[in-house]
């Protein structure tokens, strides 16, 4: 599943490529992809003649702020124009966007297509079809419609995410620290890859009970999380299967991982063999010598 760095990579690509993209036509190829409104024609009608004004990210969610366009001669930019709600996207396991100039026939796993007046297309492709989209108008609350969005913990790059916060939320937790990092209500956007890599960087065993981790270790863990995420974003995220950026390129961070998917290989620090075991149903990779 795309995690924070992959979703941020997509966000940056969308922001760069779709500057002043006005949606003139929407085609839904798989209706189950649209989670809200339940009336799919309302989704299409709501997005038509909307300018994708700004792309944001919250955890693993992409959020496009929309502006209403009265006619084709409307002057850009539209800072003071009326808002037209939000287009929210969760890529889930295999979803990704592709920008296509002079649109061609859709490929097999195309789920939703957005066109501008010049027939340029923003195409959403999803092999396993777990991804979802929402169009939410200004009269409704994003957090109420999308329950997962409203329950997210702080962003790893935010001031709210620090050692004091971590100490408070884990003080009575008997869960493993790996399970804590995967909990989106505690910290948003971290998944299996970056939990493993961050714990390795911090020298903390993924099996440690969260409440046993000391303040100085949490300081290092927070710093490791930020460093690992920034490094991955700089490499365009990680591709092990389906993830692609807007240009169809793979992410390159997978070539730099220290433990993730390196089972049986030598630790880059100590030479000990990397091991793998499941925690809460998720494959976990670690170095038994470097992580305590």
UniProtKB/Swiss-Prot annotation:
Function: Involved in base excision repair of DNA damaged by oxidation or by mutagenic agents. Acts as a DNA glycosylase that recognizes and removes damaged bases. Has a preference for oxidized purines, such as 7,8-dihydro-8-oxoguanine (8-oxoG). Has AP (apurinic/apyrimidinic) lyase activity and introduces nicks in the DNA strand. Cleaves the DNA backbone by beta-delta elimination to generate a single-strand break at the site of the removed base with both 3'- and 5'-phosphates.
Requisite cofactors: Zn(2+)
Cofactor-binding details, from the entry: Binds 1 zinc ion per subunit.
Similarity section: Belongs to the FPG family.
Zinc finger (FPG-type): 258-292
Protein name, as recorded: Formamidopyrimidine-DNA glycosylase
SUPFAM superfamilies in UniProt: Glucocorticoid receptor-like (DNA-binding domain), N-terminal domain of MutM-like DNA repair proteins, S13-like H2TH domain
Gene Ontology BP, a term: base-excision repair
Catalytic-site annotation from UniProt: 2-3, 60, 282
Gene: mutM
Catalyzed reactions per annotation: Hydrolysis of DNA containing ring-opened 7-methylguanine residues, releasing 2,6-diamino-4-hydroxy-5-(N-methyl)formamidopyrimidine; 2'-deoxyribonucleotide-(2'-deoxyribose 5'-phosphate)-2'-deoxyribonucleotide-DNA = a 3'-end 2'-deoxyribonucleotide-(2,3-dehydro-2,3-deoxyribose 5'-phosphate)-DNA + a 5'-end 5'-phospho-2'-deoxyribonucleoside-DNA + H(+)
Binding site for DNA: 109, 128, 173
EC number assigned by the record: 3.2.2.23, 4.2.99.18
Stored PROSITE patterns: FPG_CAT (PS51068), ZF_FPG_1 (PS01242), ZF_FPG_2 (PS51066)
Binding partners and assembly: Monomer.
Listed GO MF terms: 8-oxo-7,8-dihydroguanine DNA N-glycosylase activity; class I DNA-(apurinic or apyrimidinic site) endonuclease activity; damaged DNA binding; zinc ion binding
């Amino acid at each position: 599943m795309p995690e924070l760095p992959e979703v941020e990579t997509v966000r940056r690509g969308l922001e760069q490529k779709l500057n002043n993209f006005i949606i003139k036509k929407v085609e839904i190829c798989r209706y189950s992809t649209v989670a809200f409104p339940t009336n799919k024609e309302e989704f299409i009608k709501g997005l038509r003649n909307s300018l994708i004004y700004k792309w944001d990210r919250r955890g693993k969610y992409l959020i496009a702020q929309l502006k209403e366009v009265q006619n084709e001669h409307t002057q850009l930019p539209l800072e003071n124009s009326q808002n037209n709600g939000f287009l929210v996207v969760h890529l889930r396991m295999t979803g990704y966007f592709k920008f296509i100039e002079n649109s061609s026939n859709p490929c097999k796993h195309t789920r939703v297509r957005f066109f501008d007046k010049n027939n340029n297309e923003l195409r959403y492709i999803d092999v396993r079809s777990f991804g979802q989209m929402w169009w939410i108008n200004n009269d409704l609350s994003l957090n109420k419609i999308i329950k997962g969005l409203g329950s997210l913990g702080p962003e790893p790059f935010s001031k709210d995410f620090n050692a004091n916060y971590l100490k408070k939320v884990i003080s009575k937790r008997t869960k493993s620290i790996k399970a804590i990092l995967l909990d989106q209500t505690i910290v948003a956007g971290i998944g299996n890859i970056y939990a493993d890599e961050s714990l390795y960087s911090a020298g903390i065993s993924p099996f440690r009970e969260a409440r046993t981790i000391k303040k100085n270790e949490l300081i290092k863990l927070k710093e490791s999380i930020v460093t690992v995420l920034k490094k991955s974003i700089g490499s365009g995220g990680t591709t092990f299967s389906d993830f692609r950026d807007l240009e169809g390129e793979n992410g390159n961070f997978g070539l730099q991982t220290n433990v993730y998917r390196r089972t049986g290989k030598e630790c880059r620090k100590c030479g000990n063999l990397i091991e793998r075991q499941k925690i809460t149903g998720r494959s976990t990779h670690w170095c038994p010598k470097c992580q305590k």
